[in-house]
């Protein structure tokens, strides 16, 4: 489905995408969930089933039914990490200018699209010399770096990274660069 170009809003950046990261695990999971029927979705997300039951108890069956139908009919865009050119900048955004290359993050913002609106706090300027494809990994790099920081290990410590998907592989590279074994 073609979507209209989003409007520029205060506090954000309108970006013409030039590269978007395809995350095989996340995108496949979203597509897989979308292809399931109601029962399959309920089995896959028992936490949401509990929420629906709680909502039915407090707001009634009809209101809950309508809320569930609205939620299930929403289109969930794929993607959450891209790079592109700033083609519009909110008046209150001062560190990004039209024409700057930016890397963007955020489910629901930095999806697989030709143009996206992204809040400023989810955008960063791309350094000169960094290619588009590498810059599109900004979100995964940030997730990996956050995990390393949360582990709070001393330089040279021995660390174990469990799971070597995209984030795990980037985490290993960050740990090696930080002198971890």
Report the location of each language-model feature.
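Generic structural detector for well-ordered beta-strands
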Residues: 2-4, 117, 125
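Conserved SAM-binding loop and adjacent beta-strand
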Residues: 78, 118, 138-139
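A structural motif shared across PLP-dependent enzymes of the aminotransferase-like
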Residues: 106-120
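Mid-domain Rossmann-like dinucleotide-binding core that forms the NAD(H)/NADP(H) cofactor-binding site
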Residues: 134-181
């Amino acid at each position: 489905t073609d979507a209209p170009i989003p409007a520029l809003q205060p506090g954000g950046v309108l970006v013409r995408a030039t590269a978007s990261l395809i995350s095989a695990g996340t995108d496949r999971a979203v597509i897989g969930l979308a292809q399931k029927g109601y029962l399959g979705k309920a089995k896959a997300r028992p936490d949401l089933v509990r929420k629906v039951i709680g909502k039915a108890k407090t707001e009634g069956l009809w209101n809950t039914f309508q809320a569930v139908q609205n939620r299930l009919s929403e289109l969930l865009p794929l993607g959450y990490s891209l790079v592109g050119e700033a083609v519009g900048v909110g008046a209150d955004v001062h560190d990004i200018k039209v024409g700057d290359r930016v890397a963007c993050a955020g489910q629901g913002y930095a999806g697989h699209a030709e143009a996206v609106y992204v809040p400023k706090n989810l955008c960063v300027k791309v350094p000169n010399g960094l290619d588009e494809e590498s810059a599109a990994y900004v979100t995964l790099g940030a997730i990996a770096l956050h995990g390393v920081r949360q582990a709070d290990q001393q330089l040279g410590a021995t660390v174990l990274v469990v799971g070597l998907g995209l984030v795990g592989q980037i985490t290993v590279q960050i740990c090696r660069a930080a002198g971890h074994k």
